[in-house]
Swiss-Prot record:
The keyword Cell inner membrane applies. Pfam families: CRCB. It comes from the Bacteria. GO terms for cellular component: plasma membrane. This is Fluoride-specific ion channel FluC. Na(+) is not transported, but it plays an essential structural role and its presence is essential for fluoride channel function. It catalyses: fluoride(in) = fluoride(out). Fluoride-specific ion channel. Important for reducing fluoride concentration in the cell, thus reducing its toxicity.
Length: 126
């Protein structure tokens, strides 16, 4: 990949990380046991990756930098498996097993459902 690929990933990642930070500072304090900002980042990212998968599947002639910008950069910066993991572990270490399991179910199940819904949405509108 050429220099434009690096630029595309970097720009997308910066914007995605800023949005994730905004979600976190806006919503995480509402419920520390299930930080809504992290959940929003992962669910919105799950839906958008579904849209992106369907979009790029139907537009194979687009330059690869667009996929790098949107998927690797923006969605990689927006979604956060590491923060999600640390929040689940914090719940487990505090003995909040119910919150830990709810956290797991909402992030993983919700993201998978919204990814499928994103693909379906794009195909329904295309």
């Amino acid at each position: 990949m050429g220099p434009m690929g690096f630029v595309a990933v970097g720009v997308g990642a910066a914007v995605g990380a800023w949005l994730r930070w905004f979600f976190s500072v806006t919503w995480n304090a509402i419920n520390p046991a299930l930080p809504y900002g992290t959940l929003a980042s992962n669910l919105v990212g799950g839906y958008l990756i579904g849209l992106a998968v369907a979009f790029f599947e139907t537009h194979p002639s687009l330059p690869p930098e667009w996929r790098l910008l949107a998927v690797t950069g923006f969605l990689g910066g927006l979604t956060t498996f590491s923060t999600f993991s640390s929040e689940v572990i914090a719940n487990l270490m505090a003995g909040d097993y119910r919150w830990a399991m709810l956290h797991l179910a909402m992030h993983l199940g919700g993201s998978l459902l919204l990814t499928a819904f994103g693909i379906w949405s794009y195909r329904a509108l295309a």
